[in-house]
Amino acid sequence: MKLLGIFLVASFAFVLSFGEEMIEGENPLEDQRAELTSCFPVGHECDGDASNCNCCGDDVYCGCGWGRWNCKCKVADQSYAYGICKDKVNCPNRHLWPAKVCKKPCRRNCGG
């Protein structure tokens, strides 16, 4: 029983110390927003692990080759452009490119 009490006290102390670190530490989302004061044009190298907000344009994303190498800002084709646009609506640097309304692609009876 004594061992259980020691375990519970140690666990509680660990949880509290972890919570204080999260409160005192910086918010990674705020850091990302501070970094995004510019964006890359189509064809520029980009970081495949970073946000698509790094590439300028509502339908521009960071696309990579096999194994996350040779990453460049690319224009999404019509089938993916809507999803990319919806993802980029909340980009903190969206004011850097001419924003447009995200439009769903025409699936059938497109009047053509």
From Swiss-Prot:
Question: What InterPro entries does the record tag this protein with?
Answer: Toxin_34 (IPR013605)
Propeptide positions: the record gives 20-33
Q: Which GO terms describe its cellular component?
A: extracellular region
Main subcellular location: secreted
Role noted for this protein: Reversible inhibitor of neuronal sodium channels (Nav1.2/ SCN2A) that binds in proximity to site 1 and displays increasing affinity as the membrane potential is depolarized. Induces excitatory symptoms and spastic paralysis in mice.
Domain comment quoted from the record: The presence of a 'disulfide through disulfide knot' structurally defines this protein as a knottin.
* Name by which UniProt lists this protein: Mu-ctenitoxin-Pn1a
Q: Species name for this entry?
A: Phoneutria nigriventer (Brazilian armed spider)
